[in-house]
């Protein structure tokens, strides 16, 4: 899109881009999803860090966290779409980079920008990342500070691995401690599993960001 605009080719745009043509709004939907994540590299933050350098002292104290995307879609939503979720309107299909690729790209970003804080923007991490990404980061004694979103039915061993691999905060999608509400949401977890997730996260010093969702049809005070 940017290349076409810079070249002055404004008579047509790539599929998936909404644009104005006279008094009309035109959109040609994408015929297919972008699915081959292996072909994409890490994000380029060169301009951002160049600007920070130019700002000098004015940029001191800024909370610098690099955003990184390892997957799109939701592997749980492919099987059981949580009834409250409005994400992934285009497709729930789960597509993920291989753990080895993510490991290399995060390592390259950390080295290039002298950064240790990362926020994975995936709706839900690939479960293979627990052992094959964070387990490897733990083995290599990488001192990172990572945020992830994941399903809440994690085992003690898995939370221990995540913590050792640098996960300092996570959003496990607890949503409720009521069995009736969890069933209504089609979350695929029990209140006890959610409590266990909170317990072992506290034990391994992983901060948990979570919510209680209210207002479901048929909900009672109990």
Model-derived features with residue positions:
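Active-site capping/gating regions of soluble enzymes
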Residues: 222
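Acidic, low-complexity intrinsically disordered segments
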Residues: 1-100
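Conserved SAM/AdoMet-binding glycine-rich loop
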Residues: 99-209, 214-219
């Amino acid at each position: 899109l940017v290349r076409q605009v810079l070249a002055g080719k404004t008579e047509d745009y790539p599929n998936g881009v909404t644009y104005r043509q006279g008094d009309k709004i035109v959109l040609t939907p994408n015929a297919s999803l972008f699915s081959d994540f292996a072909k994409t590299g890490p994000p380029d933050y060169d301009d951002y860090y160049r600007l920070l350098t130019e700002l000098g002292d004015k940029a001191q104290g800024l909370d610098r966290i690099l955003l990184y995307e390892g997957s799109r879609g939701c592997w749980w939503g492919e099987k059981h779409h949580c009834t409250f979720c409005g994400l992934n309107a285009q497709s729930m299909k789960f597509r993920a980079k291989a753990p080895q690729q993510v490991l290399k790209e995060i390592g390259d970003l950390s080295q290039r920008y002298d950064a240790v804080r990362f926020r994975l923007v995936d709706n839900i991490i690939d479960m293979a990342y627990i052992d094959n990404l964070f387990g490897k980061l733990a083995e290599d004694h990488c001192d990172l500070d990572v945020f992830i979103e994941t399903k809440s039915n994690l085992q003690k061993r898995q939370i221990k691995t995540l913590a050792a691999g640098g996960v300092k905060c996570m959003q496990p999608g607890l949503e409720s401690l009521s069995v009736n509400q969890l069933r209504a949401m089609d979350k695929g977890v029990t209140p006890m599993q959610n409590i266990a997730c909170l317990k072992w996260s506290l034990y391994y010093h992983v901060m948990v960001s979570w919510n209680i969702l209210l207002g479901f049809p048929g909900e009672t005070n109990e």
